[in-house]
């Protein structure tokens, strides 16, 4: 029975990670006559005459282990950190947006498949009776922002029938009328064009000229516009030289926010393999407030490194060391970022804007 449960669990992990399973390969791993290939759900493989322990099913199993950089790069900016304990153990990766002077709206992941919305007070306490479970499923990483009609739009990545190779960006209205503030379920609409190749994840929304725009890629900086009919069109693509020390793809994190000077603050993360786990490190950047939205500044050190994750894993203990920012609010000199710590707990941190800017250098 235990062996069958392990097999089912491994199949589920493989489906979620790669969208398909090599049954023969899986059988070779779980074959009782090949116990040496299975030890605490890991496998050993040789790379340049070195043995590297990998998690079963992870795409990083074919990649070399990369050493972590020096402490001058892995910096943690001082901030006020808050843990948000939701009713569902293991809740993580929340998006946030300001509702009014007294309240914020938070949408988080109670598990790996669903979203729940709630209200927070200014001390980040959940307001009693405000929880609402949305009917959306097979969804990840909620980012929220108000549109010009005072509707709250939820933007997220979605998969159909666990086909992760076809992951795409969707949106839906979750509050029809800001004055009422009532959560609703409305039909979802596809945002990322169907003709785009590869998985589409972590598109970062922002508002420009009362229209929702989205950053599909950080470098090159690729910008789409979502029109009133929910049709998404690519507008701009600009290349720039990144000062970020980790030479991996810069991936989107939080929504972008317009600053007082008219430019936008945004964030990104990179993922690197280290000792069989994926380490997620976070940086920020500033881009122009005018088309084509050129990148003006970018971090050359982290504001929230992977090692700052401190929660005991509820899931993925053998897979990740991760702080994953999703939501951002900027109020005067205060930057409020919501994130998931090790895919285990919702957290919110307050930074001084000037401290984040100090992590960046000019882009020419």
Model-based region annotation:
Residues 1-63:
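Membrane-proximal basic amphipathic "stem/tether" segments
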